[in-house]
Regions:
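Non-Sec secretion/translocation targeting segments of pathogen effectors
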Residues: 147-153
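Long, charge-rich alpha-helical interaction segments
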Residues: 8, 12-15
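Flexible helix-coil linker/hinge segments at domain or subdomain boundaries
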Residues: 79-96
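Long, highly charged low-complexity segments enriched in Glu/Asp and Lys/Arg with interspersed Ser/Thr
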Residues: 112-147
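Short, small-residue-biased leader/transition segments that mark boundaries at the very start
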Residues: 1-2
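Extended serine/threonine-enriched, polar tracts that run as long, contiguous segments within proteins
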Residues: 19-83
Length: 153
């Protein structure tokens, strides 16, 4: 079931009761174990039913590095959600998924040597260039470097 896009703000959701009303679209049914709202990547039904957040968006694996990367991603997203005042859900369009996702991970705070393996695991299956949004030869600075290298030869 596709639901309409909406904006959530801190003023609108000052406590869990208000968030619960928004999550269930007015039909508060947190007592139902198999509520339809639990089948999303982020299951907030679990918050109202059990008091825990449940992420339902990762493939099963026993690889310790991948599991740690998934946990780090969930913690970073949760931290941003707590600190952020408002949010708008919208699809991001990108010609270079690898670059776009890497930039988002860095914005979440998953930067530096500490999260190198986390980024490696999360970016492993994406196509594109990590460092350059567009073809690196299209940037003026790279054109100058390439030209000077050719002149040296």
């Amino acid at each position: 079931v596709y639901k309409r896009q909406r904006t959530l703000s801190a003023e609108e959701t000052s406590d869990l009761t208000q968030l619960e009303r928004i999550w269930y679209e007015g039909d508060v049914s947190a007592g139902e174990h198999y509520n339809w709202t639990r089948y999303y990547a982020l299951n907030l039904h679990s918050v109202f039913y059990r008091g825990t957040v449940e992420w339902r968006c990762f493939n099963s694996t026993l690889h310790a590095g991948k599991v740690a990367a998934y946990v780090n991603l969930c913690l970073a997203i949760s931290s941003q959600a707590i600190a952020q005042r408002s949010t708008v859900m919208r699809k991001t369009h990108s010609d270079n998924e690898l670059f776009t996702f890497r930039v988002w991970l860095v914005r979440l705070g998953l930067n530096g040597e500490e999260f190198k393996h986390t980024r490696d695991h999360l970016l492993a299956n994406l196509d594109g260039d990590r460092a350059w949004r567009f073809d690196k030869d299209s940037y003026a600075v790279n054109k100058k470097k390439k030209k000077s290298r050719e002149m040296e030869r």
